[in-house]
Amino acid sequence: MMKKDKKKVYLISNGDFRDSAGVVCWPKQEETLKAVQKALRKLDFDPQVIPSYDPKRKHGFLTKQYEGTQAFSKIDPTASVVVVLSCWAYSHHVSGPLQTHQGPILLLANFDGTWPGLVALLNHSATLDRLCVKHSRLWSETFGDDPDFMKRLETWCKTGEIKYDKCHLVSAEEMNLSSKAAQFGEKLAKKILHEKRIMGQLDPGCMGMLNAVINPAKLGAIGMPIELLNQSDLVAEMSLVDDYEAQSHLNWLIKKGAWFDWGTDQFEHLVHSQVIMQMKMYSAAVRIYQRYGLSAIGIPYQVGLVRSVPASDLVEGMLNNSERPEVIDPETKKVICKGKPIVHFNEGDIGSGVPQVLMRDIYEAKGMPPETTLHDVRWGREYEGKFIWVFEISGGAPPAHFGGWKNAKIYRQPKMYFPLGGGTCSGVSKPGVITWTRFYEQSGEIGMDCGTGEVLALPDAEVNDRLKKTTSEWPIANVHIPGYDRDQLMASHMSNHITIGYGNILEEFVATCLHLGIPTRVAGEH
């Protein structure tokens, strides 16, 4: 009797563009691959790892799109494929080949703070959704020792898909909005459609995040047309800012109580020259915002500026804050947007920029603090019976979210990703009710997910442990979203990013979206 051949499953190791990151992350990827291989063999499948380990590069990741296309050209186009994610990875390395792949596709990630495969999974999934590529999601902390993981993996191996209960998502049209909120939303939507809100996006497609790029026709239809700008122009504008102006901005921050983690070695520490360049970038961004009549601006930084200037993150935190150094318009000699935040969407992610502008307009109309920011959905775990998310932006949040500049800490960005350094704008987000949002494009249609939650004040030991397990230099928000815990969010969230602002404006936000013609879902309890 002939032995039955085991079905092959290809395990794809997608990674970062930077080999330095690949070297650091490879041991964890290797550990994850072994766990997934073991799990598949338990189910009588034959896992094949692609690409092979490269001894010269000291890792086995795909690091560019062409490497992804080459890898997929060598496998059966109908084969089962698992993209194994144990760290941050650029989704466009594999999204092109996956668009034409005919076999089942699974995005599989660890659920870990230090090694954020879950962040990459959410980004990859949102990218594939935008490109109309059918796929499934799966995540775990322990893989083969996790019964739910094994059950779902077996289901995917047999059927080619995994389905999740998404009863935590409700169409906003089913909400019983107050008449006051409905009228508010109608009025604001009419104002936006009449006046427009121009979205300034510098060099779209940061780090391969195609989910951060939205069809211009869809944006224009909701009154938020795109202004495509170049980061090279930002650098050129920086050269026009003199040292005196830059130093004045830095002096302002120090006077307000911002703490700088100064050092002497520019390759390891935060030094004065790095921050002066950041202050020039701040003035340049404000003037570009004014010149083009923008309602928001998004600086991707990675990878386009990483070899040119220090990090943009301190700049981003300053822009998104009402209390910030004044910048003068060289033509009118007037202060630009005095006493107001200039909405900045991190990493040029228009999926955050759109709700940030809507939230800003709502907050200002209601006389509430208008600061907003996006965060990575970085990790989470239970604390005293509640699942508390670690939301962590990769460098700069508005100090208003920490309770003011006196609570802001500026660290050097980690050298692995930021060789030219530059400061973060970090702190621990203050306790309070928040509204969260996410705008996206899926299968050719736009959508908005939103809800409410609460930033919690955790004991210092717990906060420090969460920072230690993620990235200690970055801003953190410890957030509980009732009804949107680990498995609910991981099953349905439409990005690796989530946008937050303080105060409950959910009804006004939903009403505005519906009147703009944006299909909207409300997640969790509300």
Region spans (language model):
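An N-terminal assembly and electron-transfer interface module characteristic of large anaerobic redox
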Residues: 1-526
